[in-house]
Structure formats: structure tokens, C-alpha cells
């Protein structure tokens, strides 16, 4: 284990621990702590990428939990065009127990944003961006459940927006798949990527249990959202279930990232269990829920209730790459009301960017069992598996 320490007031994380590889082909696992100011951040991958990923997650969480700067207080119709204000009103009406009049007349704290398509500057409610309970405390009654879906951090604004778009597509694809139980295609669990650490993870997981890989991309969308599932009945294995998801412009890239994410979740849960921790030690409700899903039945429930829209199992990973323009055109056909929150700061003489993509016409967060706008432009109550509308997706 390698530990790196920084000063208390440093912009950089307090402690970083890099665990040794299980073998020369396995990915590195890096974790970051910061004097309990944020929840730990982690990443897996090739050595440098795991370090970069963990640091990026640290900066992202630090910003969205602690550093959201709000503007003045305005009503929805004062801060944005009427069509967007109406969409947010309907979303908050579903989420809260308040009337439309109460939502329309309420003055929300604001943050700056721009429309994803027109690039027009506007403001949006800070409560859908800030993850703490202080920044927009008076607005929490309209939007109590929040998460990091759609968030991104990068040294380039374009790359940060691209990261947010991928996060956004992952969330929408995952929730629609969970609620409807439909996947586009299945990818062979015996797939070979030609990338050492990816193939090594798949080999290790296959030797211990079962793997299923599904393309769950939103219907008609360019690119690929790949969900990788792992489950085992092995009684001596601490980890019975794990999963990873990634959206990318090529199938191979999405698959590889989803496998790494599955492995990251696997290692995090394994470290937690061997450390002797319990549910009482977990603050994050998503992580607490994911820990409760650590059973083989979570794997079988997903696999047995997945309807494939195509019976063909993919045996190879073609390299068809879609452009961001195609994705933007696809999203705009569904809704014009997609917005990008953005902020920047200087870290060690470099400019870095934070972004988050949100839309009242899509799922606003990932907890479908909580206070959410479940009726939107891509899903309506009763369109899928009814029992799942009140049961959170088994995902970290």
C-alpha cells in the first residue's frame, strides 16, 4: 500500500492509498480520504488511470458537496424560459407534496447554467445541484433526494461536458432498463477484449461465478450503455453480487469501462466486509442499499426478468463509433429542456471544470423508489414492471 499525505488546507486530498495488484495483469485500485470532509473516493484501472480517476472523483465530490455558490432567489419563471419552468414545475409536483401554485410562487436559490443545445445562459434551482443540506436548505422540500448522476470533473470544459453526458445516459438507460426489464442485446460472457486487465477480470469472475453482459442503451440512442452483472452461489465468497455500467461511443469502450466499474464495486464491498464494518457505518443511502443487495438473488432477479429485444448474442466487439452530434440530436428530439451546470477553479496553476447535466423531462436522479419524477418523457407509471417502481435499482 502506498500512502500520500497532503497538508490540512491543501486543495489536494489528505490521503491516498494505492493497493497492490493481485497479479501483474489485474488493475490497480486507488482510494482517497480527506479528513472526513467528503465520502471516500476510489477508482480502478491501469496504475495512472486509477490514480487520476480517484483524484477526479475526489474533486467532483468535494465541489458538489461543499462548494456550490448560489446566486439570488427567483421563481422558476423568473430564471428560465416558460417551457422549462413548466417542466420543472411538473417534476417538482411529482417529487414533493406541494401544490403547483406553491412551486410556481416559491423563490429558489439559483446557480448558473446553459441550455445544452442553444448554449443560452440561464439559471436553474441550486437544490438540484448542491448535494449538501445547507446550501439550499429552504428548497429541500421540493427536491429532497439528490446524487452525483450527471456530474463530471475535468481539466477541459468539453471533456467535462462529455463526461456529464455519459453519466446522464448511464442513469437514464439504467433506470429505464430496471423499470421495464428490457435490454437491446446480450454480449457473450466469454468475450475477449484483447486488453490484459479487462480479460483478467473477466477470467477471474468466470472462475468464481456467473457473468451476464447486456446492452441497455436508451431505445434508438447512438452509442452504447453496457451493464455487466456478476453473481455467485459460492458459499465461501463474501461477494455474491456486483455490477458495473458505462456509456460510451463504442461498444468495446463501454464494455471495458463497465467491467472496471464492476471490479471497483467488488473491491470496495470486499474491503468493507473484511474490515468488519456494518450497515451502521455507512452514511450514503445508495451504498447501504447496494450492500443489502449482496446476494445471488439480486443477480438472478435481473437476469431472469430481462427481455432481449434481439436474440442474437454478440460474440465480437465492433468498433463503430458514434459522434457527440448524433447524441445531441437524439436527446433534442426528446426534449429541449436539458441544462448544463458549470463552474471552474484554478488548481495548481491549471484551470479545471465541474459540470452536471440535468433535465426535468428525464429522471432527475437514480433513486426510483424515492421522491422522483417517475412520469417523464421516457417513462410513465405502469409502463413497466410495477413492483420495481417502488424498489430501488440494485446499483451502487
Curated annotation (Swiss-Prot):
Cellular component GO terms held in the UniProt record: cytoplasm
Keywords, ordered alphabetically: Antibiotic biosynthesis, Cytoplasm, Plasmid
Matches recorded under InterPro entries: YcaO-like_dom (IPR003776)
Domain of life: Bacteria
Keyword Cytoplasm: yes
Domain annotation YcaO: ranges: 41-396
UniProt-annotated location(s): Cytoplasm
Biological processes, Gene Ontology terms: antibiotic biosynthetic process
Function recorded in the entry: Necessary to process the inactive microcin B17 (McbA) precursor into the active peptide.
Name of this chain's protein: Microcin B17-processing protein McbD
Amino acid at each position: 500500500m502506498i500512502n500520500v499525505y497532503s497538508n490540512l488546507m491543501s486543495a489536494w486530498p489528505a490521503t491516498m492509498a494505492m493497493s497492490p495488484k493481485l497479479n501483474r495483469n489485474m488493475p490497480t485500485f486507488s482510494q482517497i480520504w480527506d479528513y472526513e470532509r467528503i465520502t471516500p473516493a476510489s477508482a480502478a484501472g491501469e496504475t495512472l488511470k486509477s490514480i487520476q480517476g480517484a483524484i477526479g472523483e475526489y474533486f467532483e465530490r468535494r465541489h458538489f458537496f461543499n462548494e456550490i455558490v448560489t446566486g439570488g432567489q427567483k421563481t422558476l419563471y423568473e430564471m428560465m424560459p416558460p417551457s422549462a419552468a413548466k417542466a420543472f414545475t411538473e417534476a417538482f409536483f411529482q417529487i414533493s407534496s406541494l401544490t403547483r401554485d406553491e412551486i410556481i410562487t416559491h423563490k429558489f436559490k439559483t446557480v448558473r447554467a446553459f441550455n445544452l443545445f442553444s448554449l443560452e445562459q440561464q439559471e436553474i434551482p441550486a437544490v438540484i445541484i448542491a448535494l449538501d443540506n445547507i446550501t439550499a436548505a429552504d428548497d429541500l422540500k421540493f427536491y429532497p433526494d439528490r446524487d452525483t448522476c450527471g456530474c463530471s470533473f475535468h481539466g477541459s470544459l468539453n471533456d467535462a461536458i462529455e463526461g456529464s453526458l455519459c453519466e446522464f445516459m448511464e442513469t437514464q438507460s439504467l433506470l429505464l432498463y430496471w423499470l421495464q426489464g428490457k435490454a437491446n442485446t446480450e454480449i457473450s460472457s466469454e468475450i475477449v477484449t484483447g486488453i490484459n486487465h479487462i480479460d483478467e477480470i473477466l477470467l477471474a469472475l468466470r472462475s468464481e461465478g456467473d457473468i451476464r453482459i447486456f446492452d441497455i442503451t436508451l431505445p434508438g440512442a447512438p452509442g452504447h450503455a453496457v451493464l455487466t452483472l456478476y453473481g455467485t452461489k459460492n458459499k465461501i465468497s463474501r461477494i455474491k453480487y456486483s455490477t458495473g455500467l458505462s456509456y460510451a461511443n463504442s461498444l468495446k469502450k463501454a464494455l471495458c469501462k463497465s467491467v472496471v466499474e464492476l471490479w471497483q464495486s467488488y473491491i470496495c464491498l470486499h474491503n468493507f466486509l473484511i474490515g468488519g464494518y456494518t450497515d451502521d457505518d455507512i452514511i450514503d443511502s445508495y451504498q447501504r442499499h447496494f450492500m443489502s443487495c449482496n446476494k445471488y438473488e439480486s443477480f438472478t432477479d435481473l437476469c431472469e426478468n430481462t427481455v432481449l429485444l434481439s436474440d442474437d448474442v454478440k460474440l465480437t466487439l465492433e468498433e463503430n463509433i458514434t459522434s457527440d452530434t448524433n447524441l445531441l440530436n437524439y436527446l433534442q428530439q426528446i426534449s429541449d429542456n436539458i441544462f448544463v451546470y458549470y463552474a471552474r477553479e484554478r488548481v495548481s496553476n491549471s484551470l479545471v471544470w465541474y459540470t452536471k447535466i440535468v433535465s426535468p423531462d428525464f429522471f432527475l436522479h437514480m433513486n426510483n423508489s424515492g421522491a422522483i419524477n417517475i412520469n417523464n418523457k421516457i417513462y410513465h407509471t405502469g409502463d413497466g414492471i410495477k413492483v420495481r417502481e417502488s424498489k430501488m435499482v440494485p446499483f451502487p
